[in-house]
Amino acid sequence: MDAEDGFDPTLLKKKKKKKTTFDLDAALGLEDDTKKEDPQDEASAEGGAAAEEDNLDLESFGKKKKKKKKPFNMDEIEAAIPSFGGDDVAASEEPEEEEINLDMDFSMAKKKKKSKKKELDELFADQADDDKSEDKENDEDNSSTWFGSDRDYTYDELLKRVFEIILDKNPDMAAGRKPKFVMRPPQVLRVGTKKTSFANFMDIAKTLHRLPKHLLDFLLAELGTSGSMDGNQQLIIKGRFQPKQIENVLRRYIKEYVTCHTCRSPETILQKDTRLFFLQCESCGSRCSVASIKSGFQAVTGKRAAIRAKTT
């Protein structure tokens, strides 16, 4: 068979090398390719096997087996390996880089947590400092509103400033309560048929913090009569008067000579300068002059006869 056909095993090797490719699909599908070979190749392979059996050479038999396994040649596989080996190496290196990146990320995350804690502490500290600075600025604004400003203030601003000072000096007014001046009602008694006794005159004068003489002059001038103090410190007034009349006179006296004309505070002092009286307020500090006491109309009854006699 070998002599007739003239097949050489070396030629078979060359033919197989020509048919083999570097493609893995071809390497994996060698079994299918061997099935699709020509019948002449199968016949030559059978002839070669017969010749090998005749020679009974173990070494050549072993070589023939290697020749059959030649499609799985290591040279071809090594030639194909580098194209895939580089990818495999790159693929193997990428997870290492990812692991390194992950480690770096974890470390950075830990640092960020620490930095967040520090940032929170710094934020709280900054907020506390800001609150303190704002409180100080508010205190400075309240204490020195006019400091460091040259502009002209509006009427509303000035009015607001005045009311703020009044509220600072009078905390009772901050709650919407005006200071009320409480005074005892006058005790008026009838003395005979033509005189009236003002029993608690001295007590009212002490309550108003005024001199009894000044109050007496105003009372007699407003009532248009005369009167004097007796031994029991009671005011005896000529004429018949009702308690309501005495109370109205006292109200006018308090409004004019006791309460402040600015803040209506009863905490005032009546001072005399030369011929004028000045009302000094201890609450708001205002100072204003008051009218002098003038005697009103007085009826002349006892002297009319003498006057008429002189004229006639």
Curated annotation (Swiss-Prot):
SUPFAM superfamilies: Translation initiation factor 2 beta, aIF2beta, N-terminal domain (SSF100966), Zinc-binding domain of translation initiation factor 2 beta (SSF75689). It comes from the Eukaryota. It is found in: Cytoplasm, Cytosol. InterPro entries: IF2/IF5 (IPR045196), Transl_init_fac_IF2/IF5_dom (IPR002735), Transl_init_fac_IF2/IF5_N (IPR016189), Transl_init_fac_IF2/IF5_Zn-bd (IPR016190). Keywords: Cytoplasm, Initiation factor, Metal-binding, Phosphoprotein, Protein biosynthesis, Zinc, Zinc-finger. The modification Phosphoserine is found at S44, S133. The keyword Protein biosynthesis applies. This is Eukaryotic translation initiation factor 2 subunit 2. It comes from Drosophila melanogaster (Fruit fly). The lineage of its organism: Eukaryota, Metazoa, Ecdysozoa, Arthropoda, Hexapoda. The gene is eIF2beta.
